Amino acid sequence: MESIMLVATDLDRTLLPNGQQAESPLARPLFRRFASRPDVRLAYVSGRHRAVVEDAIAEYDLPKPDFVIGDVGASLYEVRGDTWLARADWCEVIAKDWAGYGHDELAALLAALPNLRLQEASKQAPHKLSYYAEPLADPAVLLVRVRRELAQVAARINLIWSVDETTHTGLLDILPASASKLHALEFLRTSLRIPLE
């Protein structure tokens, strides 16, 4: 039996252009040819939510993936044709970090913090709480306040701070501590029984 290879790539600024960075002209054709190999299981990895990933796949005519890690690692999908199946086993692993609290309960704890504005519902996920903020040069004070508020409920969290360069907007994602793109990828590789080579 031929061994299976898990090929994972981030989308923005790796496989696809984003912002002012130009696309490498041969990247997609070469990638498409490689991804079509029968021994390849393809995973796209993104900080973005499902709808944006689906749009990027369509817009750039990317090969259909077998798996998608989205929401900065808070979501893991198995893709079968046009059907995206959320991996419940991944959700169970990361949900433990929030100590039984849900998305809305954690959001309520942060409601009084100034300069945080909850992102649209389409950009939220069961295990990802996303906010807009001022594009701070040093977000350390804000991040300390967020950690302090969420420590009240013993939630173990991972804070992801970034700035959208196109809109000059600060972005804060709050995830379970064990949710990350790398951890989701390691979980997927292990669940597929693909050795690390």
Show the residue positions of the predicted features:
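Asp-based phosphoryl-transfer active-site loop
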Residues: 2-21
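A general structural motif
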Residues: 2-4, 39, 65, 126, ...
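Active-site phosphate-binding/coordination module
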Residues: 25-121
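Conserved acidic, metal-coordinating active-site core of Asp-based
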Residues: 104-197
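Charged helix-capping and loop-helix junction motifs
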Residues: 24-27, 143-145
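Alpha-helix termination/capping residues and helix-transition junctions
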Residues: 1, 59-62, 191-193
